[in-house]
Amino acid sequence: METLTASFFVRIASSIRAGYPTNMTDPIALVDRFGRRHDSLRISITDRCNIRCFYCMPEHDAEFLPRSGVLTFEEIERLAGLLVKRCGVRDIRITGGEPLVRRDCVDLIRMLARIDGLEDLSMTTNGMLLRDHAADLRSAGLKRLNVSLDTLDEATFVKIARRPGVDRVIDGIDAAIEAGFESIKLNALAIRGLSESELVGLVRFSIEKSVTLRFIEFMPLDSDRAWKSKDVLSGDACLKLLSEAFGDVTPTGRENPSAPAETFTLRCDGREGTIGIIRSVTRPFCGDCNRLRLTADGGLRNCLFSQSETPLRDAMRSGCDDDKLIQKIQQCVGEKHAAHGIDSDDFRPPERAMHAIGG
């Protein structure tokens, strides 16, 4: 019988918090030293993109992975299956770069949707290619979509994305609605000096389309390393602006303890809408983090802001078996810090920009 050590109670508490039966004979539960159980996986399938948002990647001369350096669909399927079937991962989100620029992306969705035990399969996209792919993605098994939309104005879109195309994004959102996804959320970065004039229009748009809108505090993930804390339009500032425009903004909590967004309801022209505020900078939610990230070249990251990665691609290609891969995954989880530390004096942004990590 296991002795009643502190680690015993941590694992009991973690299992209860995660909503799973406690199984003390299971050595593979991905619980870190702070009791956080990791059941959510972000998989980046490319570091390439068809726009150049300043908060994500450089405008010119971006260095991309060679094709041989990117995980194959079969390698992604192997790791995803291992994490779901043997490590308790329950949801997977496909990211990039822009995932839809990778050829035959729909085939990968179909492969992942067949994994026994996977409860949720979603994607984050810039929406530019959704008109061409939304129906096929839905029929392949993709359940939910997050679409980046920082503005409805073309001039502002070009300022952010350094490419034209907001009309294509809006058309892609319409295509996603037509395809019948279980959930569609719009993600808007909250950037001081830019977003203040966009908030109200985006809220009206989201209510008109009957989708959820989330404002995400601007984070230090830009390739130019130009981020400063003064550039963050805080969640509190967003709520103040929305209250001035719409009146009561009523908090409704989080979808679940590990959800990054605090949700609110408000009314516009007699219709109710739902918004989310993700305070990654001013009110971090690291204590409830349940996420792991897999980069396009097979690096496993235990935090978006981690300074290190566990290289799983090379391990697989050198013949590493599943048990050894799990050991590497467990070690990565075990090294996770308590928090990202953006507010600390010694904080350093990750070496990779957002497009190379995966959104």
Swiss-Prot record:
Top-level taxonomic group: Bacteria
Transmembrane segments: none
Binding site for S-adenosyl-L-methionine: Y55, G97, S148, M219
Cofactor note as given: Binds 2 [4Fe-4S] clusters. Binds 1 [4Fe-4S] cluster coordinated with 3 cysteines and an exchangeable S-adenosyl-L-methionine and 1 [4Fe-4S] cluster coordinated with 3 cysteines and the GTP-derived substrate.
UniProt keyword terms in alphabetical order: 4Fe-4S, GTP-binding, Iron, Iron-sulfur, Lyase, Metal-binding, Molybdenum cofactor biosynthesis, Nucleotide-binding, S-adenosyl-L-methionine
Chemical reaction(s) catalysed: GTP + AH2 + S-adenosyl-L-methionine = (8S)-3',8-cyclo-7,8-dihydroguanosine 5'-triphosphate + 5'-deoxyadenosine + L-methionine + A + H(+)
Binding site for [4Fe-4S] cluster 2: C286, C289, C303
SMART domains listed in its UniProt record: Elp3
Residue numbers binding GTP: R42, R93, T124, K185, R291, L292, R293
Residues that bind [4Fe-4S] cluster 1: C49, C53, C56
GO biological process, one term: Mo-molybdopterin cofactor biosynthetic process
Claim: Hydrolase is one of the keywords in the record: no
Entry annotated with the keyword Nucleus: no
Domain Radical SAM core: 33-260
Cofactor: [4Fe-4S] cluster
GO function terms (MF aspect): 4 iron, 4 sulfur cluster binding; cyclic pyranopterin monophosphate synthase activity; GTP 3',8'-cyclase activity; GTP binding; metal ion binding; S-adenosyl-L-methionine binding
Pathway given in the UniProt record: Cofactor biosynthesis; molybdopterin biosynthesis
EC id: 4.1.99.22
Function: Catalyzes the cyclization of GTP to (8S)-3',8-cyclo-7,8-dihydroguanosine 5'-triphosphate.
HAMAP family: MoaA_B
Subunit-structure text: Monomer and homodimer.
Membership in a protein family: Belongs to the radical SAM superfamily. MoaA family.
The protein, known as: GTP 3',8-cyclase
Organism expressing this protein natively: Rhodopirellula baltica (strain DSM 10527 / NCIMB 13988 / SH1)
Encoding gene per record: moaA
